[in-house]
Amino acid sequence: MTKVADQKLSRAGEKNFQWAKAHMGALTTLAKKYSRTKPLEGVSLGVCLHVTKETSVLIDAFLGAGAAVKLAGANPLSTQDDIAAYLSTRTEVWAWRGQSSKDYDWCIEQVLGARPTQLVDDGADLHVAAHRSRAKGIVGGSEETTTGVVRLRAMQAAGKLAYPVVAVNDARTKFLFDNRYGTGQSTLDGIMRATALLLAGMKVVVVGYGWVGKGVAMRARGMGANVSVVEVDPVKAIEAHLDGFGVSSLEEAAHWGQLFVTTTGQKNVVPYAAVEMMKEGAILANAGHFDVEIDVKTMLSKAKSVREVRPHVDEVLLPGGKKVYLVAKGRIANLVAAEGHPPEVMQMSFANQFLAAVRVHREHGSMERRVYGVSAEDEVARAALKSMGVTIGAQTKEQREYAKSWEA
């Protein structure tokens, strides 16, 4: 049975659903096309995604294609309660903002208890939970995030992956736009909503220079911040340097940075020892999926006091008397303190999720127990271009033949 914060919020949720839908033409075009043939008829989808207005458009597409859907939120603090209420009028939902870890795990168990045949995940918590005891009957799934794909590839390497999974995150139409432009804009949106401080002139330290880090660094510089990058990969460090950013070690940056944003998907990239070196008033925020990038556990265990000074901002008084500020409790700032990615970006990511579900249903019998790349990049890109009002040309026959030739 559905469990959401407040069913009375459903009308507000429907309005936000309609707003997002109007700005997600790539997904809605595909949804309309596939609603005629119902390619997901008979499929039971277990879904664990951030319950946002954009996600509601994907759920609508799944339902229109004939699937039965059971939904849980992908983070204890990211659910938009009005959207959860609206979706609960159309399918079963277990999601509300402000869950405990126990609540979060319980919601995932409700989805798995419905015996889905395919999984759609963000962060791989649903996949991992299924592998503990409920993988039987699941024919395949998909994964949205860098973090989740890393976990699933580790499972594959260990010989533990029980079914094929499509790595939506590997799609160019996902990581080039969602990870970079989506996270770049929405992370700063979350930080600015939470702190209400001026970014212009601020010394911002971006930890990690993958696609997410690139997006955050680019947007922070666009707001007038003085941006430096911390990176352990020498190639990415060169890239950051040639992109015009300062590059330093975390130990160096800790002494002068004012805002630190983690973007790596790794654990303890800002350890407590670095926090101790930071200047009075330093702000820490995380753009990664899990709350492990900043060593929040150690910091809070050693703190003399912790108090909320603004919504989504905790003041942490360190043993030496210094104060630092933690945004969104170290969880994913763009979804906790703001609304997540813009719909124009999510139209592509979720179009890939939609097509991945169709692919798994059609092809799972011939797929191996491993992580697969996406297979419909052009279809998604062309639908997105159309929704943006952009037209492009095509190669001529002569050019296609030249590309195949090897003689001068």
Regions found by a protein language model. Name each.
Residues G73, Q118-G123, R134-G148, Q266, ...:
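ADP-ribose/adenylate-binding Rossmann-like module
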Residues T29-K32, L63, A124-V128, S133-K136, ...:
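Rossmann-fold NAD(P) dinucleotide-binding segment
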Residues M1-L40, L71-T79, A84-M202:
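Glycine/serine-rich phosphate-binding loop and adjoining beta1-alpha1 elements at the start
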Residues G66-A68, A135-G137, Y163, G224-A225, ...:
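A short helix->loop->beta-strand "cap" motif at the edges of active sites that frequently abuts
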Residues L9-A26, G42-S44, T52, Y163-G201, ...:
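Adenosine-phosphate binding glycine-rich loop
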Residues V4-D6, K15, T28, R36, ...:
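Ligand-binding pocket scaffold of soluble enzyme catalytic domains
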Residues L49-G66, D178, G182-W256, T262-K267:
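Glycine-rich phosphate/diphosphate-binding loop of Rossmann-like nucleotide-binding domains
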